C-alpha cells in the first residue's frame, strides 16, 4: 500500500521528509506536525558531530520543507515538542552541521583515499571509536555524503593498483 493522503484517516496529512531515512514521512493532524527524525537535537549533533543520513540531498531538501509546514506545534522523534520558530532555528543548526560534514569530507579527500581510509579519518576527526554498529551506521552515512559530493561534481574517483580512490575535484 503506497503511503498517500487518501489512505489516511480524515484530517491527517502525510509529510514527505526523506533524507535521514529512506522514504521517511511525518504526519500533520490539525495544528500539530509529527516530523520523526527530520531534525536532530543540538545535543546529539554536538556530541557525535555526524549522524546517520540515508540521502544528503533529500535530507537538505526536507530541512527546507519544514519552513512550509503550517502548524503551531512540531513533534520530532527525539527532541521535545517545539513551536515553528524553535523548529526553524534547530533546522538551521542541522543544515549548518551537514554543511560542515560536507566540507570536512572534501578536506579529507584533498589527497586520494580509499573509502576505508576516509572512514578511518572521519572516525578520527570526530573522535569516535569504531565498532560494528558505528562502522555500519557511519559507513553508510559516509557513502551518502560521497554520493552527494560525486553527483555535485565536487569529488571524483579513480582506480589505482586495483583500489578505488576518492579525491576532491580542484576548482
Predicted feature residues:
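C-terminal regulatory/interaction regions
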Residues: 107-171
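Residue-level signal for tight coil/turn positions that link beta-strands
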Residues: 9, 29-31, 161
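A structural motif corresponding to the C-terminal end of an alpha-helix
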Residues: 1, 66-70, 154
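Metallo-beta-lactamase
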Residues: 13-18, 22-102
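Active-site HxH/HxHxD metal-binding segment of metal-dependent hydrolases
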Residues: 1-8
Amino acid at each position: 500500500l503506497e503511503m498517500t493522503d487518501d489512505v489516511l484517516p480524515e484530517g491527517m496529512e502525510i509529510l514527505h521528509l526523506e533524507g535521514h531515512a529512506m522514504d521517511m514521512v511525518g504526519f500533520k493532524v490539525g495544528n500539530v506536525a509529527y516530523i520523526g527524525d527530520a531534525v536532530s537535537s543540538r545535543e546529539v549533533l554536538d556530541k557525535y558531530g555526524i549522524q546517520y543520513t540515508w540521502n544528503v540531498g533529500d535530507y537538505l531538501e526536507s530541512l527546507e520543507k519544514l519552513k512550509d509546514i503550517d502548524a503551531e506545534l512540531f513533534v520530532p522523534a527525539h527532541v521535545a515538542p517545539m513551536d515553528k520558530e524553535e523548529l526553524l532555528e534547530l533546522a538551521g543548526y542541522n543544515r549548518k552541521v551537514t554543511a560542515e560534514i560536507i566540507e570536512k569530507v572534501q578536506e579529507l579527500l584533498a589527497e586520494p583515499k580509499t573509502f576505508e581510509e576516509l572512514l578511518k579519518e572521519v572516525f578520527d576527526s570526530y573522535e569516535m571509536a569504531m565498532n560494528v554498529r558505528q562502522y555500519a551506521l557511519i559507513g553508510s552515512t559516509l557513502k551518502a555524503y560521497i554520493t552527494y559530493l560525486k553527483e555535485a561534481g565536487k569529488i571524483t574517483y579513480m582506480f589505482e593498483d586495483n583500489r578505488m580512490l576518492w579525491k576532491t575535484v580542484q576548482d
